[in-house]
């Protein structure tokens, strides 16, 4: 076949294949055109998942009648001069409308703000008709019917109407977040119509718009971000670590107001949460990057979804640093979703709040419905760290006075009605209840600390909490000096696969910075001669195996700093107070105070929450008091 020129229709259809992938792509292009025209009200109507009808109505500046044919012609635009690097509009190629008209039936109606009447043009399968008079209010109406009728093969790749409608909703929401001063409406998606009222401009207006899109729960768990470095400004809101999702659909990134799905930006976001969130969870964030258009290339993808920065390292460093700083400064702040989940668990099917009046029945357990008659408690015994089981020895969080500890039976049958000296002694000081995590009141199942604040009840996972404290202590110690080690009287020999042993031995110098002295002991074994002094006793065999797995996973993919963090996290897990270990009240309170003073203590190294707070008002609702 000889070389020849393609027809204009075929050229536009090829271009449409790059720009118009699905109905949501059409909505994106039309809504961006409306915003570029200065619209403050945009209405979107769809039908058949966008396959049969797409209509966007705006109150923007409009298109003069003599420019309507140009608007649907390829490479005709009012948004771009001769400088292709100074792009300030959302659209600029002049490809969207002609691409849509080549594969669908497009009708474009417009009436400029200073015109007495409107006109319209139609494009069907690439063939232009008009302009002709049309009755409409000031602004523009772009209507698309029978998408891909000219290229029916494309219809085979469309998803269900519900899936396409969901994609359209997502596009409208993503654009709406960046323009809170614009009123958006969306109808025809077989769901409740979307109505987003204009909220104005500024940070508060943006947060209000975000709450409209993501719900108020995000606003209750969000941290404000505002940082600038070398002419690049980062603003927006990010969720606290315990407020997360199972997918990345609630992550929004904008570059100079343009919604993007750039892997580099979302990778930096993920890096900022690396040691405070589980690997299978995703942060919720809305980030706005503002920089000189000359320092970013938005013309690297047909749909303008990806961008390329002149200095990607600067952008990544700004994102990671700003978010980490915000997380560190957030202090003690539990996710409201944690309390909601707890309430839902209490409200499981079959649960009924207790009635104020009912008949008491004696119980063999020593209490009755409506009243409590505790069984006789066991005598109190003197507690001694020297005589306690190793798993129950006190946590070393500073010197604490000795005290009398009741055994498990006594704890289970405490007489809450007795006004004796014991109750007076156990009463938490008022000043402790004023602390963010309150005063420790009890330890249940030798794993969870229950504390009381002025207006809430807090439940702390002692292992997860101490794991975070040890992890942060290890990281801080590494910045100042190598961690001191404690020599083992008899070296511990750990058998490993030969490849794992060799890999671990190559990192002996790195591990020595943590006070862990190892050396290869034959082809498939590691000799451990020294362990970190600050971690105390630990299961050396399991620690070495876990470190081997951690290094194998991250050895080639991450730098030294990231590697050190992973090693510190693994050591912290082995060096923290274990579940099943009983703590003294002084130790529990010391743990709470350390949590309040430690950044990121709301989650452990694996991203699990370290505590949950239940407000008194929520408890009262459970018991029918509210």
UniProtKB/Swiss-Prot annotation:
Signal sequence region: none
Domain of life: Bacteria
GO biological process: mismatch repair
Span list, region Disordered: 352-399
GO cellular component: mismatch repair complex
Record keywords, A-Z: DNA damage, DNA repair
InterPro entries attached to this UniProt entry: DNA_mismatch_repair_CS (IPR014762), DNA_mismatch_repair_MutL (IPR020667), DNA_mismatch_S5_2-like (IPR013507), HATPase_C_sf (IPR036890), MutL/Mlh/PMS (IPR002099), MutL/Mlh/Pms-like (IPR038973), MutL_C (IPR014790), MutL_C_dimsub (IPR042120)
Single GO MF annotation: mismatched DNA binding
Keyword DNA repair: yes
Biological function: This protein is involved in the repair of mismatches in DNA. It is required for dam-dependent methyl-directed DNA mismatch repair. May act as a 'molecular matchmaker', a protein that promotes the formation of a stable complex between two or more DNA-binding proteins in an ATP-dependent manner without itself being part of a final effector complex.
Family of this protein: Belongs to the DNA mismatch repair MutL/HexB family.
Name of the protein in question: DNA mismatch repair protein MutL
Species annotation: Brucella anthropi (strain ATCC 49188 / DSM 6882 / CCUG 24695 / JCM 21032 / LMG 3331 / NBRC 15819 / NCTC 12168 / Alc 37) (Ochrobactrum anthropi)
């Amino acid at each position: 076949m000889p070389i020849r020129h393609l027809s204009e229709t075929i050229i536009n259809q090829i271009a449409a294949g790059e720009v118009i992938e699905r109905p949501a792509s059409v909505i994106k292009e039309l809504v961006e055109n409306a915003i570029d025209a200065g619209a403050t009200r945009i209405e979107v109507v769809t039908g058949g998942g966008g396959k049969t009808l797409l209509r966007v109505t705006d109150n923007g500046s409009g298109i003069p009648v003599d420019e309507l044919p140009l608007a649907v012609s390829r490479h005709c635009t009012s948004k771009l001069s001769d400088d292709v690097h100074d792009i300030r509009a959302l659209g600029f190629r002049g490809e969207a409308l002609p691409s849509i008209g080549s594969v669908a039936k497009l009708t474009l109606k417009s009436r400029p703000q200073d015109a007495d009447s409107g006109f319209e043009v139609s494009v069907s399968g690439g063939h232009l008709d008009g302009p002709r008079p049309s009755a409409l209010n000031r602004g523009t109406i772009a209507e698309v019917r029978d998408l891909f009728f000219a290229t029916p093969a494309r219809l085979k790749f469309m998803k269900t109407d519900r899936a396409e409608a969901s994609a359209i909703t997502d596009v409208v929401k993503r654009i709406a977040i960046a323009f809170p001063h614009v009123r958006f409406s969306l109808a025809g998606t077989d769901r409740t119509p979307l109505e987003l009222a204009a909220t104005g401009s500024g940070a508060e207006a943006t947060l209000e718009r975000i709450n409209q899109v993501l719900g108020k729960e995000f606003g209750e768990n969000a941290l404000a971000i505002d940082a600038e470095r070398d002419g690049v400004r980062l603003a927006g809101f990010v969720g606290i670590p315990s407020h997360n999702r199972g997918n990345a659909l609630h992550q929004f990134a904008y570059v100079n107001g343009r919604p993007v799905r750039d892997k580099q930006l979302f990778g930096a976001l993920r890096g900022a949460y690396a040691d405070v969130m589980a690997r299978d969870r995703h942060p919720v964030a809305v980030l706005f990057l503002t920089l000189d258009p000359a320092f970013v290339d938005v013309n690297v993808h047909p749909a303008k979804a990806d961008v390329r920065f002149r200095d990607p390292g600067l952008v990544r460093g700004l994102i990671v640093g700003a978010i980490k700083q915000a997380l560190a400064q957030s202090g003690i702040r539990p996710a409201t979703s944690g309390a909601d989940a707890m309430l839902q668990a209490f409200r499981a099917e079959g649960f009924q709040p207790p009635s104020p009046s009912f008949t008491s029945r004696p119980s063999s357990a020593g209490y009755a419905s409506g009243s409590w008659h505790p069984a006789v408690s066991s005598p109190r015994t003197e507690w001694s760290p020297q005589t306690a089981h190793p798993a129950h020895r006190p946590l070393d969080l500073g010197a604490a006075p000795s005290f009398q500890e009741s055994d498990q039976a006594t704890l289970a049958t405490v007489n809450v009605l007795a006004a004796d000296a014991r109750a007076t002694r156990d009463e938490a000081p008022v000043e402790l209840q004023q602390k963010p995590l309150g005063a420790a009141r009890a330890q249940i199942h030798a794993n969870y600390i229950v504390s009381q604040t002025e207006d809430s009840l807090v439940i702390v996972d002692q292992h997860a909490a101490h794991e975070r404290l040890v992890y942060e202590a290890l990281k801080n110690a590494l910045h100042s000096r190598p961690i001191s080690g404690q020599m083992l009287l008899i070296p511990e020999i750990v058998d490993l696969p030969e490849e794992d042993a060799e890999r671990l031995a190559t990192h002996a110098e790195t591990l020595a910075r943590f006070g862990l002295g190892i050396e290869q002991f034959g082809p498939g074994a590691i000799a451990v001669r020294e362990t970190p002094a600050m971690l105390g006793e630990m299961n050396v065999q399991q620690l070495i195996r876990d470190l081997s797995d951690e290094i194998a996973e991250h050895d080639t993919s991450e730098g030294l700093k990231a590697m050190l963090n992973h090693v510190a996290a693994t050591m912290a897990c082995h060096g923290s107070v274990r579940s099943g270990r009983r703590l003294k009240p002084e130790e529990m309170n010391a743990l709470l105070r350390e949590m309040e003073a430690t950044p990121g203590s709301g989650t452990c190294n694996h991203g699990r929450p370290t505590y949950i707070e239940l407000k008194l008002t929520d408890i009262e609702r459970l018991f029918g008091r509210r």
